[in-house]
Amino acid sequence: MRIRTAAFTLVGVAAFAASAAAQTTPAPPAIIRTAVAATKLPTVTDVPLYFKAVSVTLAPGATSRASAANGILYQISGSTEVSIGAETKTLGAGEGLFIASGKVASLKAGNAEPSNFLHFLLVPATDLDRPAETAPATVRELYRTVTPIPGLKAGGYDLNLTRITFPAQMPSNPPHHRSGAALYYIVSGTGANTVDGKAEARGPGSLIYEPFGLVHQWGNPGNQPMTFLAFNINPDGVPAVLPGAPVKTQ
């Protein structure tokens, strides 16, 4: 009897373990964040600043020059050799580089195919209409903020570009706001952007501006991952994203 009871006990334990394993829900896919380029700015309050984004195309082997405000290049396809002073770096698809205000960058497309890249800029009003790249580059403006970025404070700021991928069927994240500001560019997939309770689909090529104080949410209801770029500015030592609405000060 004892042997039979022990056998039944072992069978029961095994069945329970199998049932528990079958009921275990796999963890949802994680959000993937990749830092593309970043720098630190000692101040952002000397003059009002704007976001601007342009797309640039260089024919195979063609050269151009970039001399503009603080900004970050992001290579979409092809390759670009970027030379700043004595330093040279070749950008492949998905790579980026910060170019500081006042620096002149020489750009050369690879010989195999055209070079296509984005140039995200943090510019004063005096540079808004200034071409980011010289001929023979084909430059197309994608976006500029109508008014200066609000809420910038004295002190240092982080300026960065991050590539983020939301997994398929990701529910909207909790309401949040930017401590500084950000400009999004949707690379692939379609996300749901919710502001004031209204959700709007945002597909490839969309640009979305998030100034300080804008409470919003992001999700991905689609069956494919959604990848986007976030050109972001936030106070040094403060998270780029903060929960809920900004705390009102007296």
Tell where the protein language model's regions lie, with residue ranges.
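Short acidic-glycine-tyrosine-enriched beta hairpin
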Residues: 59, 85-102, 196-214
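A short, N-terminal "cap"/entry segment at the start of jelly-roll beta-barrel domains
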Residues: 21-55, 89-93, 97-100, 112-160, ...
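Positively charged n-region of N-terminal signal peptides that target proteins for export
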Residues: 1-5
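N-terminal, post-signal-peptide region of Sec/Tat-exported proteins
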Residues: 45-89
